């Protein structure tokens, strides 16, 4: 279903938080939404891989990588895993790699920047905890909506038929 974050902001101005415009789109899908699942990690993506093994239908993975852009937390292999398991999208407060492959996958991916260096594969980090970046706090079970214009967050699902 097509979403327009500008229209959603107009309709639900009092209900949504707007993430600061620091992200770029790298995936093959320009707009996506779903229930938030969080991971907090630093320059490692083992825990991300574990979470992406889960059924992602109706879910968006929000990764707090501390804003670090020295290593790509998502690469083509992890993005394909997300597609295979039905994830709607991935938001990375950090870097991604293998951009040419990411843009051909059927998933939305927003991140700070691309870099060719891979993350380490340790499972260090935490999941399903509140994370804060971009001027908002993301709680597991919140709802996130993203397109090329921006990213918004709501505690309740928004009626996309309005």
Curated annotation (Swiss-Prot):
Its main location: cytoplasm. One of its GO terms (biological process) is regulation of RNA metabolic process. It is found in: Cytoplasm. One of its GO terms (cellular component) is cytoplasm. CDD domains: RraA_family. It holds the Pfam family RraA-like. InterPro entries: RraA, RraA/RraA-like, RraA/RraA-like_sf, RraA_gpbac. Keywords: Cytoplasm. GO terms for molecular function: endoribonuclease inhibitor activity; enzyme binding. Disulfide bonds: none annotated. Globally modulates RNA abundance by binding to RNase E (Rne) and regulating its endonucleolytic activity. Can modulate Rne action in a substrate-dependent manner by altering the composition of the degradosome. Modulates RNA-binding and helicase activities of the degradosome. Homotrimer. Binds to both RNA-binding sites in the C-terminal region of Rne and to RhlB. Belongs to the RraA family. HAMAP family: RraA (MF_00471). This is Regulator of ribonuclease activity A. It comes from Haemophilus influenzae (strain 86-028NP). The lineage of its organism: Bacteria, Pseudomonadati, Pseudomonadota, Gammaproteobacteria, Pasteurellales. The gene is rraA.
